[in-house]
Regions:
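Short, small-residue-biased leader/transition segments that mark boundaries at the very start
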Residues: 1-5, 227-230
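Active-site-proximal beta-strands of protease catalytic cores
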Residues: 2-16, 25, 29-37, 95
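Hydrophobic alpha-helical scaffolding
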Residues: 21-25, 100
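C-terminal recognition in membrane/secretory proteostasis and scaffolding
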Residues: 33-230
Length: 230
């Protein structure tokens, strides 16, 4: 769809391919971001590397805000744009690139429609005082490498597929991009892992009180347990 000046405003989109009088549209700035990244061979949207909670009426009163709007940051991911900007837990994000941030969904949208590799402003409230942060947009981190492993043998993880979790891998597989560690990507139908309730998105933290930090570490511990049981 275009405005009166014939500038592209929306791009029509329907997942079903049919039409019953309902219109679908994607904002043109998101289309431009996607088109630019497709020209480089893959759709890559900017990733902030921070998560938080929408400011509701109760939080607005608690922090002395005029109205319930914004996102209070709970966590930032190492080496992310959020860290580069100096964003900290407790900061309240009010706008990105001079565009208001009403809630968590709007924050994600604002970031997703920015151009990669460019510098933008972020308006925050920190300790009750306004501040302007600047950050350069980045693609989701690809470290660590997934090193995907399908588990076999006599152990409770038989039939599970595991991988090292990175923000890029998480987003590609519909997982939480703020989590770290070894993640269950899927469990084969009818497998031991599925029967035990292991499912996509589960994070393996420890096995027999031994911390699991990566796929190699997981594999070594599981193999040692199999050896002990034999």
């Amino acid at each position: 769809a275009s405005d009166v000046y014939k500038r592209q405003i929306f791009s029509n989109k329907s997942g079903a391919g049919g039409s019953i009088g309902i219109g679908f549209a994607v904002p043109s700035n998101m289309v431009k971001t996607v088109v630019d990244s497709v020209e480089k061979g893959k759709v890559i949207r900017p990733w902030l590397g921070a998560t938080g909670q929408t400011i509701d009426s109760d939080l607005a009163r608690e922090f002395g805000l005029k109205r319930p709007a914004g996102v209070i940051i709970n966590e930032v991911y190492p080496e992310s744009s959020a860290v580069d900007a100096g964003l900290k837990p407790g900061d309240i994000v009010l706008s990105i690139d001079n565009k208001s941030v009403e809630d968590r969904d709007v924050l994600r949208y604002r970031i997703a429609t920015l151009a990669l590799g460019k510098t933008f402003s972020m308006e925050v409230i920190r300790n009750g005082k306004p501040a302007i942060l600047r950050f350069k947009t980045k693609a989701p981190l690809t470290k660590p490498q997934p090193n995907t492993l399908e588990v076999t043998g006599r152990n409770p993880f038989n039939g599970a597929v595991l991988a090292n979790l990175s923000p890029a891998f998480a987003l590609d597989n519909g997982l939480d991009d703020m989590k770290r560690g070894v993640v269950i990507v899927r469990s084969r139908r009818g497998s031991v892992a599925e029967r035990l309730g292991l499912k996509k998105g589960d994070i393996v933290l420890t096995i027999n009180s031994k911390k699991i930090s990566e796929v190699k570490n997981f594999k070594d511990i599981v193999l040692s347990l199999i050896h002990i049981s034999e």
